[in-house]
Amino acid sequence: MHRQLRYAVLATALFASTAFAGARQELDTFTRGLKGLDGQFSQRVTDANGRVKETSSGRVALATPRQFRWEYAKPYKQLIVADGKKVWVFDPDLEQVTVRAQGSEEQNSPLVALIDPALLDKKYDVSEEAAPRDGLQWLSLTPKVDTDASFQIASLGFGREGLARMEVVDAVGQRTAIGFSGWKRNPAFAADTFRYTPAKGVDVVGDAQ
Protein backbone atom coordinates (compact mmCIF):
# COMPACT_ATOMS: atom_id res chain seq x y z
CA MET A 1 0.00 0.00 0.00
CA HIS A 2 1.38 3.42 -0.93
CA ARG A 3 2.64 5.12 2.21
CA GLN A 4 0.82 8.40 1.66
CA LEU A 5 -2.53 6.73 1.03
CA ARG A 6 -2.58 4.60 4.14
CA TYR A 7 -4.52 7.15 6.15
CA ALA A 8 -7.65 6.46 4.05
CA VAL A 9 -7.74 2.90 5.38
CA LEU A 10 -6.36 3.71 8.77
CA ALA A 11 -9.02 6.30 9.31
CA THR A 12 -11.51 3.45 9.56
CA ALA A 13 -10.48 2.54 13.08
CA LEU A 14 -11.89 2.84 16.50
CA PHE A 15 -13.88 2.91 19.65
CA ALA A 16 -14.85 -0.05 21.81
CA SER A 17 -15.95 -1.30 25.25
CA THR A 18 -14.94 -3.67 28.02
CA ALA A 19 -18.24 -5.49 28.53
CA PHE A 20 -19.11 -9.03 27.49
CA ALA A 21 -22.34 -8.02 25.76
CA GLY A 22 -22.83 -8.08 22.00
CA ALA A 23 -20.52 -5.98 19.88
CA ARG A 24 -23.16 -3.32 19.12
CA GLN A 25 -24.06 -2.92 22.79
CA GLU A 26 -20.37 -2.68 23.67
CA LEU A 27 -19.89 0.02 21.06
CA ASP A 28 -22.94 2.02 22.19
CA THR A 29 -21.85 1.84 25.82
CA PHE A 30 -18.27 2.86 25.21
CA THR A 31 -18.97 5.84 22.95
CA ARG A 32 -20.91 7.60 25.71
CA GLY A 33 -18.62 10.39 26.90
CA LEU A 34 -15.75 9.25 24.69
CA LYS A 35 -13.59 12.16 23.52
CA GLY A 36 -10.34 10.43 22.62
CA LEU A 37 -8.17 7.30 22.65
CA ASP A 38 -4.45 6.59 22.67
CA GLY A 39 -2.82 3.21 22.08
CA GLN A 40 -0.55 1.00 20.01
CA PHE A 41 -1.26 -0.75 16.72
CA SER A 42 0.18 -3.42 14.45
CA GLN A 43 -0.93 -3.67 10.83
CA ARG A 44 -0.85 -6.41 8.19
CA VAL A 45 -1.91 -5.86 4.56
CA THR A 46 -2.63 -8.80 2.25
CA ASP A 47 -3.77 -8.91 -1.36
CA ALA A 48 -6.88 -10.68 -2.66
CA ASN A 49 -4.91 -13.97 -2.81
CA GLY A 50 -3.75 -13.72 0.80
CA ARG A 51 -0.16 -12.72 0.01
CA VAL A 52 1.37 -10.36 2.57
CA LYS A 53 2.16 -6.97 1.05
CA GLU A 54 3.11 -4.99 4.13
CA THR A 55 3.47 -5.17 7.91
CA SER A 56 3.93 -2.18 10.19
CA SER A 57 3.44 -0.98 13.75
CA GLY A 58 3.38 2.15 15.84
CA ARG A 59 1.16 4.37 17.96
CA VAL A 60 -2.25 5.90 17.30
CA ALA A 61 -4.19 8.74 18.94
CA LEU A 62 -7.70 9.92 18.09
CA ALA A 63 -9.90 12.72 19.39
CA THR A 64 -13.07 14.59 18.55
CA PRO A 65 -13.71 16.33 16.29
CA ARG A 66 -11.97 14.59 13.34
CA GLN A 67 -8.48 14.59 14.82
CA PHE A 68 -6.05 11.69 14.54
CA ARG A 69 -2.35 10.88 14.71
CA TRP A 70 -0.78 7.70 13.30
CA GLU A 71 2.90 7.46 14.21
CA TYR A 72 4.67 4.59 12.44
CA ALA A 73 7.79 3.17 14.08
CA LYS A 74 8.41 0.02 11.98
CA PRO A 75 9.49 -0.89 9.34
CA TYR A 76 10.16 2.81 8.69
CA LYS A 77 9.12 6.03 10.37
CA GLN A 78 6.17 8.03 9.11
CA LEU A 79 3.77 10.46 10.74
CA ILE A 80 0.16 11.16 9.70
CA VAL A 81 -1.59 13.98 11.54
CA ALA A 82 -5.10 15.38 11.03
CA ASP A 83 -6.05 18.56 12.89
CA GLY A 84 -9.70 18.64 11.83
CA LYS A 85 -9.06 20.74 8.74
CA LYS A 86 -5.91 19.37 7.10
CA VAL A 87 -4.04 16.06 6.87
CA TRP A 88 -0.23 16.11 7.09
CA VAL A 89 1.82 13.09 5.93
CA PHE A 90 5.47 13.41 6.95
CA ASP A 91 8.19 11.09 5.61
CA PRO A 92 11.42 11.71 7.60
CA ASP A 93 13.62 9.76 5.17
CA LEU A 94 12.47 12.03 2.32
CA GLU A 95 12.46 15.17 4.48
CA GLN A 96 9.07 15.88 2.89
CA VAL A 97 5.55 16.49 4.15
CA THR A 98 2.41 16.32 2.01
CA VAL A 99 -0.58 18.35 3.15
CA ARG A 100 -4.18 18.42 1.94
CA ALA A 101 -7.61 19.41 3.19
CA GLN A 102 -9.53 16.74 5.10
CA GLY A 103 -12.21 15.46 2.78
CA SER A 104 -14.49 12.58 1.88
CA GLU A 105 -12.06 9.86 3.05
CA GLU A 106 -12.63 10.95 6.66
CA GLN A 107 -16.24 12.09 6.31
CA ASN A 108 -17.30 8.70 4.94
CA SER A 109 -15.23 6.48 7.19
CA PRO A 110 -16.47 4.56 10.25
CA LEU A 111 -14.21 6.78 12.36
CA VAL A 112 -16.55 9.75 11.97
CA ALA A 113 -19.65 7.62 12.58
CA LEU A 114 -18.12 6.04 15.68
CA ILE A 115 -17.23 9.40 17.18
CA ASP A 116 -20.75 10.56 16.30
CA PRO A 117 -22.89 7.41 16.79
CA ALA A 118 -25.94 9.12 15.27
CA LEU A 119 -24.25 8.73 11.86
CA LEU A 120 -23.56 5.01 12.22
CA ASP A 121 -26.88 3.65 10.96
CA LYS A 122 -27.25 6.53 8.51
CA LYS A 123 -24.06 5.68 6.63
CA TYR A 124 -23.73 1.92 7.18
CA ASP A 125 -25.67 -1.32 7.32
CA VAL A 126 -24.61 -2.58 10.73
CA SER A 127 -24.71 -6.24 11.78
CA GLU A 128 -23.25 -8.48 14.45
CA GLU A 129 -21.55 -11.76 13.60
CA ALA A 130 -23.59 -14.61 15.08
CA ALA A 131 -20.68 -16.24 16.92
CA PRO A 132 -17.34 -15.06 18.34
CA ARG A 133 -14.32 -15.29 16.07
CA ASP A 134 -10.74 -15.45 17.36
CA GLY A 135 -12.16 -14.90 20.83
CA LEU A 136 -13.73 -11.57 19.85
CA GLN A 137 -17.25 -10.23 19.29
CA TRP A 138 -17.51 -8.72 15.80
CA LEU A 139 -19.47 -5.82 14.35
CA SER A 140 -19.63 -5.47 10.54
CA LEU A 141 -20.14 -2.15 8.74
CA THR A 142 -21.13 -2.08 5.06
CA PRO A 143 -21.41 1.33 3.32
CA LYS A 144 -24.96 2.05 2.15
CA VAL A 145 -23.62 4.02 -0.83
CA ASP A 146 -20.64 2.29 -2.46
CA THR A 147 -19.23 5.45 -4.01
CA ASP A 148 -19.03 7.17 -0.61
CA ALA A 149 -16.45 4.86 0.94
CA SER A 150 -12.98 3.55 0.18
CA PHE A 151 -13.86 0.03 1.39
CA GLN A 152 -16.41 -2.73 0.83
CA ILE A 153 -16.75 -3.84 4.43
CA ALA A 154 -15.14 -3.07 7.79
CA SER A 155 -15.24 -5.45 10.74
CA LEU A 156 -14.52 -4.38 14.32
CA GLY A 157 -13.54 -7.04 16.87
CA PHE A 158 -14.14 -6.37 20.57
CA GLY A 159 -12.45 -8.10 23.50
CA ARG A 160 -12.04 -7.61 27.23
CA GLU A 161 -10.16 -4.32 26.81
CA GLY A 162 -12.30 -2.86 24.03
CA LEU A 163 -11.50 -2.67 20.34
CA ALA A 164 -8.88 -5.35 19.77
CA ARG A 165 -8.89 -5.66 16.00
CA MET A 166 -10.18 -4.10 12.81
CA GLU A 167 -10.35 -5.68 9.36
CA VAL A 168 -11.03 -3.68 6.20
CA VAL A 169 -11.58 -5.09 2.69
CA ASP A 170 -11.32 -2.66 -0.23
CA ALA A 171 -12.83 -2.74 -3.73
CA VAL A 172 -10.07 -4.97 -5.17
CA GLY A 173 -10.13 -7.48 -2.31
CA GLN A 174 -7.09 -6.16 -0.46
CA ARG A 175 -7.43 -6.80 3.27
CA THR A 176 -5.97 -4.61 6.01
CA ALA A 177 -5.96 -6.10 9.51
CA ILE A 178 -5.01 -3.86 12.43
CA GLY A 179 -4.52 -5.06 16.00
CA PHE A 180 -4.86 -2.58 18.87
CA SER A 181 -3.51 -2.72 22.44
CA GLY A 182 -2.85 -0.55 25.47
CA TRP A 183 -5.83 1.76 24.99
CA LYS A 184 -6.05 4.84 27.22
CA ARG A 185 -9.53 6.35 27.26
CA ASN A 186 -9.90 10.17 27.24
CA PRO A 187 -6.20 10.83 27.96
CA ALA A 188 -4.75 14.30 28.54
CA PHE A 189 -3.19 14.87 25.11
CA ALA A 190 -0.21 17.19 24.71
CA ALA A 191 -1.14 20.47 23.02
CA ASP A 192 0.72 19.56 19.81
CA THR A 193 -0.58 15.97 19.47
CA PHE A 194 -2.89 16.88 16.59
CA ARG A 195 -0.84 19.71 15.12
CA TYR A 196 2.06 19.52 12.69
CA THR A 197 4.59 22.28 12.09
CA PRO A 198 7.18 21.57 9.36
CA ALA A 199 10.74 21.77 10.62
CA LYS A 200 13.31 23.91 8.84
CA GLY A 201 14.52 22.18 5.68
CA VAL A 202 11.42 20.00 5.22
CA ASP A 203 9.85 20.27 1.76
CA VAL A 204 6.12 21.01 1.90
CA VAL A 205 3.99 19.58 -0.93
CA GLY A 206 0.41 20.84 -1.16
CA ASP A 207 -1.51 23.73 0.38
CA ALA A 208 -0.34 24.41 3.93
CA GLN A 209 -2.38 27.64 4.24
Swiss-Prot record:
Signal peptide positions (record): 1-21
Task performed by this protein: Participates in the translocation of lipoproteins from the inner membrane to the outer membrane. Only forms a complex with a lipoprotein if the residue after the N-terminal Cys is not an aspartate (The Asp acts as a targeting signal to indicate that the lipoprotein should stay in the inner membrane).
Protein name: Outer-membrane lipoprotein carrier protein
Subunit and partners: Monomer.
Family: Belongs to the LolA family.
InterPro entries assigned: LolA/LolB/LppX, OM_lipoprot_carrier_LolA-like, OM_lipoprot_carrier_LolA_Pbac
Compartments, record wording: Periplasm
Domain of life (superkingdom): Bacteria
Gene Ontology process terms (BP): lipoprotein localization to outer membrane; lipoprotein transport
